[in-house]
Amino acid sequence: MKPTNEPKKPFFQSPIILAVLGGILLIFFLRSFNSDGSFSDNFLASSTKNVSYHEIKQLISNNEVENVSIGQTLIKASHKEGNNRVIYIAKRVPDLTLVPLLDEKKINYSGFSESNFFTDMLGWLMPILVILGLWMFMANRMQKNMGGGIFGMGSAKKLINAEKPNVRFNDMAGNEEAKEEVVEIVDFLKYPERYANLGAKIPKGVLLVGPPGTGKTLLAKAVAGEAHVPFFSMGGSSFIEMFVGLGASRVRDLFETAKKQAPSIIFIDEIDAIGKSRAAGGVVSGNDEREQTLNQLLAEMDGFGSENAPVIVLAATNRPEILDPALMRPGRFDRQVLVDKPDFNGRVEILKVHIKGVKLANDVNLQEVAKLTAGLAGADLANIINEAALLAGRNNQKEVRQQHLKEAVERGIAGLEKKSRRISPKEKKIVAYHESGHAVISEMTKGSARVNKVSIIPRGMAALGYTLNTPEENKYLMQKHELIAEIDVLLGGRAAEDVFLEEISTGASNDLERATDIIKGMVSYYGMSSVSGLMVLEKQRNAFLGGGYGSSREFSEKTAEEMDLFIKNLLEERYKHVKQTLSDYREAIEIMVKELFDKEVITGERVREIISEYEVANNLESRLIPLEEQAS
């Protein structure tokens, strides 16, 4: 949706501005009257002069004034000079000789009220009117931005414009299964009569689910582009505003506009903003505006009056588990299409799409980049290509080289390299032992990812060093020994500090937290312990947003104590095993630490070389895990 380009009115044609100016003029006009309805002297005078009371009395004594008006706090004396009338105004002071003096000089005098009914009323009403005017002005501006006036309830019609996307399926890569699922939708939209003649009902809606950055919006645009139909897009949060009923009104307007241009596609991004379940834990939620909007969406998707106007609703979310069951039933969202993170081949194809227009050197190997980026989404890969191009430009290079791509991958995974951050030799030594411990355990533990690089250069906000592990492929299942291997690798850093420095630091805090979470999952969710057996103790949170496990406790205090004891014992058992492994390879780790201290970075190949040379020199049986067994 794009806002229409409506001509703006000139500033002084705004009704609110004109009303304010009119009110100011009215005040000046009403102030020209006395309380008896006659024009005030100030209005008839050519000029007024503020003088002292003594001067006014002197003018009266010299017979230089014609009329005197006496108020409660002011005294006015008028004097005519040729064709001009001058009014002298002074603060009144208690003076019993004034009236006798006026009688003696035979000067006309009278009393006057210093305020009148009109100005008194305006004095009370004007602040209220100003506040009301400002509120109406701000509310009107806000509602215009939302698609309507203050009393127009923000009609969505002014915001809706149909797009004709130029995106095609060929512009997408890495989601072949998802594309196959929606190809049929394109056929429905192109040839609706073919299916109508067979008595088939066209699907009302397709829900695209998957992690952030996997191309759900792009896929929806590609469907519209392939079918050559109008594409209406709106974010879920755009339906709900401060006025109750506005969301339902916008849903009606959106579907009405789409039906007029049918066949067409409506795309609702982040539909969980309006489609959240109305009951959570058996208690009905109380957001009336969202519920009205959802009810209207359900009614529209039931297709009242739309049998001959094929409008297909595509929606995207990364939180399908919280959507209302009424929204998910057949007849509304008939299908769910998983748009997942790409596998190795998918990443290669996505990289090929994003390198179009980028000048690449001959040494660029996209397969190697794809191996380094397991678990990343399409948006991450696009960012890596762009970051590599920026790095090449920053270094005044004419082409993007493989090194730029590798640096971009590391930057995306570990954060920006902080070469300016100076750490003391003592801390540098601690970090070198810590990262060497991670690297050695990773290379000698079956089921762990292969080491690609070890660095003690600070990166990101907190990392003083890092070990870059690159799994050969995405993992969809984890066996128990693989979880144990991950725990061992996480404990390797702290164990190395303990073995070689005989003192531990705070650098392993995140490693310990992650190791604890893995064991907690084994106990409470995966049924991999004697504590729970096959019983699930906690529910997993959002699968696509990485929410971990729920905090609701569905077990007794005794079970909680047993769980804590199991986690503690397993951590101690694996820590003891890791310390023993590092002690067995003490000299190899010392060599690794020295090279890290001198060079700051060593490759995974060099790590494996150091371990292998140590084993040969000491006639040890190799404990290095071969590549084909590394993640099996």
Curated annotation (Swiss-Prot):
Q: Which residues lie on this side of the membrane: Cytoplasmic?
A: 1-9, 138-632
Coiled coil spans = none
Which InterPro entries does this one have?
AAA+_ATPase (IPR003593), AAA_lid_3 (IPR041569), ATP-dep_Zn_Metalloprotease (IPR050928), ATPase_AAA_core (IPR003959), ATPase_AAA_CS (IPR003960), FtsH (IPR005936), P-loop_NTPase (IPR027417), Pept_M41_FtsH_extracell (IPR011546)
Describe its membrane topology: Multi-pass membrane protein
Instruction: Report the locations given in the UniProt record.
Output: Cell inner membrane
GO terms under cellular component? plasma membrane
User: What is reported when this gene is inactivated?
Assistant: A homozygous disruption strain was not identified, suggesting this gene may be essential.
Report the function annotation for this chain: Acts as a processive, ATP-dependent zinc metallopeptidase for both cytoplasmic and membrane proteins. Plays a role in the quality control of integral membrane proteins.
**Mind telling me what this protein is named?**
ATP-dependent zinc metalloprotease FtsH
Recorded source organism is Helicobacter pylori (strain ATCC 700392 / 26695) (Campylobacter pylori)
